[in-house]
Curated annotation (Swiss-Prot):
The keyword S-adenosyl-L-methionine does not apply. It is a single-pass membrane protein. Zn(2+) binds at residue 501. One of its GO terms (biological process) is triglyceride metabolic process. The chain crosses the membrane at residues 532-552. It comes from Bos taurus. This is Glycerol kinase. Keywords: ATP-binding, Cytoplasm, Glycerol metabolism, Kinase, Membrane, Metal-binding, Mitochondrion, Mitochondrion outer membrane, Nucleotide-binding, Nucleus, Transferase, Transmembrane, Transmembrane helix, Zinc. It is found in: Mitochondrion outer membrane; Nucleus; Cytoplasm, Cytosol. The gene is GK. ATP binds at residues 20-22, 287, 332, 433.
Length: 559
């Protein structure tokens, strides 16, 4: 019975899905796209100062090893032979920046996460010296000059971390986004690891020319980035190197398996949703929220605050495809904030129960601009607000407002995309962990006033990475021909409110967004000692107390 089961499975493909909140390793049947097994580990985020977001690159790498080991263990329990795994793909959180020592394999600083805001004053000073015109960066990269992207994070590390400066001087430093760090480590690390990235991840650094598909010398000179530390840029589907993890007893059977697919997480989801045609779009609900529309082989530049990015290049000799993207910084992260910071919920799943209890925000609106506002505003001065509170408001209303906020932000970027493309989307394909929340999906259909369509298997990001890996030349176990792609079962959510109510709620949300702007100004120092500022409140308290004591004595006539 067991041998018969093995015989029908055919070639398997694994996928590392390394996101902002968690790491997963998933294994798919390449003939049916069926998910056979997976394991997930939550990843810590560190907030050393206001606006700073970091992660430990070694913890990220260890989480990958753990997920591979546990998944292989589960496959063994299912009597599935892991030697059937013929390739591995990688999808990853984009923009997050790592610099490490190529001789020791040690990170030289924590990973600076895409959400991090410490580089705002760097962005402002750079914007004042853009050569020629304000489109210098955007015309080459498709991106606005923003704290979001890797170049300014790398610039900060070079300016402020002595270990990084010294390693660059001594030709020991390597830079990469999370995909580069993982592929280098998984293919041998300091003992011959492959230092590479793919076109989708490179296109998020602000150093990559999306027309020539090469690192841009002028951009590197503008940001003062030494090109010798940059990874080699490859397509999204080719053999980069072979797995070398013999130190891991349970995952050692994957030794020698090719890593042959690599896509930034949002591009991976586009592939996993099979959005291969011009005009097809998907929205992924993760830590942030990302709406991508395939624009085919042409670069479409937005006039409404969207990004132009590389969608995928599925083979060395295959054409590059582009996408328009609307990025929302905070989606699932707001649920984590309600859990970890406010203690309103004990688990992420609990928010659906709270929202269901009331079925309305009761006029409460939540703008979770914790890291400023991304598309379509690109407003770093914004901060989170909750408004419309009354004595009747309770945690259930706030939970509902948090879910609505995700949907309103999606509406904003969908409106921008419809204006850029000229043809409104008739429905929205969705994926990501938050799509398991049925109230969120129904709210999204109501607020967009179009149907929302969700695949029954929500792991489309990992699926996209697996498809790219399995289709690579030299692997060839996964066909991407339209006639060979597996049919996907979908769940459909139709709008249940009238258009007028949808518009009223949306217009009130827009008022709340306006109130969130202009809350902060750039701090004078990005690297100053925070302990200096910590002492100021105490100083003010002492001085004001002495003044009040003297005043009281004077008024009472005391000597």
């Amino acid at each position: 019975m067991a041998s018969a089961k093995k015989a029908v499975l055919g070639p398997l493909v694994g996928a590392v899905d390394q996101g902002t909140s968690s790491t997963r390793f998933l294994v798919f049947n390449s003939k049916t796209a069926e998910l056979l097994s997976h394991h997930q580990v939550e990843i810590k985020q560190e907030f050393p100062r206001e606006g700073w977001v970091e992660q430990d690159p070694k913890e990220i790498l260890q989480s990958v090893y753990e997920c591979i080991e546990k998944t292989c263990e589960k496959l063994g329990q299912l009597n599935i032979d892991i030697s059937n795994i013929k390739a591995i793909g990688v999808s990853n959180q984009r923009e997050t920046t790592v610099v490490w020592d190529k001789l020791t394999g040690e990170p030289l600083y924590n990973a600076v996460v895409w959400l991090d805001l410490r580089t705002q004053s760097t962005v402002e000073s750079l914007s004042k010296r853009i050569p020629g015109n304000n489109n210098f960066v955007k015309s080459k990269t498709g991106l606005p000059l923003s704290t979001y992207f890797s170049a300014v994070k790398l610039r900060w590390l070079l300016d402020n971390v002595r270990k990084v400066q010294k390693a660059v001087e001594e030709d020991r430093a390597l830079f990469g986004t999370i995909d580069s760090w993982l592929i280098w480590s998984l293919t041998g690390g300091a003992s011959g690891g492959v230092h590479c990235t793919d076109v989708t991840n490179a296109s998020r650094t602000m150093l990559f020319n999306i027309h020539s598909l090469e690192w841009d010398k002028e951009l590197c000179e503008f940001f003062e980035i030494p090109m010798k530390i940059l990874p080699n840029v490859r397509s999204s589907s080719e053999i980069y190197g072979l797995m070398k993890i013999s130190h891991s007893p349970k995952a050692g059977a994957l030794e020698g398996v090719p890593i042959s697919g690599c896509l930034g997480d949002q591009s991976a989801a586009l592939v996993g949703q099979m959005c291969f045609q011009d005009g097809q779009a998907k929205n992924t609900y993760g830590t942030g929220c990302f709406l991508l529309c395939n624009t085919g082989r042409k670069c479409v530049f937005s006039e409404h605050g969207l990004l132009t990015t590389v969608a995928y290049k599925l083979g060395r000799d295959k054409p590059v495809y582009y996408a328009l993207e609307g990025s929302v910084a905070i989606a699932g992260a707001v649920i984590r904030w309600l859990r970890d910071n406010l203690g309103i919920i004990k688990s992420s799943e609990e928010i659906e129960k709270l929202a269901k209890e009331v079925g309305t925000s009761y006029g409460c609106y939540f703008v979770p601009a914790f890291s400023g506002l991304y598309a379509p505003y690109w407003e770093p001065s914004a901060r989170g607000i909750i408004c419309g509170l009354t004595q009747f408001t309770n945690k259930c209303h706030i939970a509902f407002a948090a879910l609505e906020a995700v949907c309103f932000q999606t509406r904003e970027i969908l409106d921008a995309m419809n204006r850029d493309c000229g043809i409104p989307l008739s429905h929205l394909q969705v994926d990501g962990g938050m799509t398991n929340n049925k109230i969120l999906m129904q709210l999204q259909a109501d607020i967009l006033y179009i149907p929302v369509v969700k695949p029954s298997m929500p792991e489309t990001t990992a699926l996209g990475a697996a498809m790219a890996a399995g289709a690579a030349e030299g692997v060839g176990v996964w066909s991407l021909e339209p006639e060979d792609l597996s049919a996907v079962t979908m769940e459909r959510f139709e709008p249940q409110i009238n258009a007028e109510e949808s518009e009223i709620r949306y217009s009130t949300w827009k008022k709340a967004v306006m109130k969130s702007m202009g809350w902060v100004t750039t701090q004078s120092s990005e690297s100053g000692d925070p302990s200096i500022f910590c002492s100021l409140p105490l100083g003010f308290f002492i001085v004001s107390s002495v003044v009040m004591l003297i005043g009281a004595r004077y008024l009472s006539g005391m000597p």
